[in-house]
Design a protein with these regions (language model features):
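Juxtadomain coupling helices with adjacent low-complexity linkers
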Residues: 2-28, 111-112, 117-129
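Sensory/regulatory domains in signal-transduction proteins
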Residues: 63, 67-125
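Structured interaction and signal-relay segments at domain junctions
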Residues: 22-84, 88-90
Length: 129
């Protein structure tokens, strides 16, 4: 495994502090909202926390997507990406996504919080849960 960035204990603690945020977003928005927390320490298996991964079959240890890799340059100055649409490798489901940069005390990007909303879920199901 190749390190992308050397992380401090503080960096690890900052990323861990996002676990309950991911859980809270999922509790509010339901099973159709996938939340993936990525650490930029190891890009090959950057996903360190996944909620509702059944939407894209992502799990802990999954790598950054190509879109997230391309976002690295823009996230040096921006904190939140523009919303974008993606599909999984098999073409389903259609998801609307946003990527949020996570910074350490030196303002270096150390991770991403990616929110992916499954748009194939009927509105009635979204409102019911």
């Amino acid at each position: 495994m190749t390190k992308f960035i050397a992380f401090s204990e503080e960096d690890h603690a900052i990323l861990a502090s996002y676990f309950p945020i991911a859980d809270g977003i999922a509790a509010l928005l339901g099973e159709q909202c996938e939340i993936v927390l990525h650490s930029l320490e190891f890009l090959e298996n950057s996903a360190i926390y996944v909620v509702n991964g059944q939407n894209s079959d992502r799990k802990i240890g999954s790598p950054l997507t190509d879109h997230a890799l391309h976002s690295l340059h823009h996230m040096r100055t921006d904190s939140v990406s523009q919303p974008y649409f993606i599909r999984t490798a098999n073409g389903e489901p259609l998801m609307k996504s946003v990527t949020i940069a996570i910074r350490n005390s030196k303002q270096h990007v150390i991770g991403f919080l990616c929110l992916n909303m499954n748009l194939n879920v009927p509105a009635a199901q979204f409102l019911r849960k």
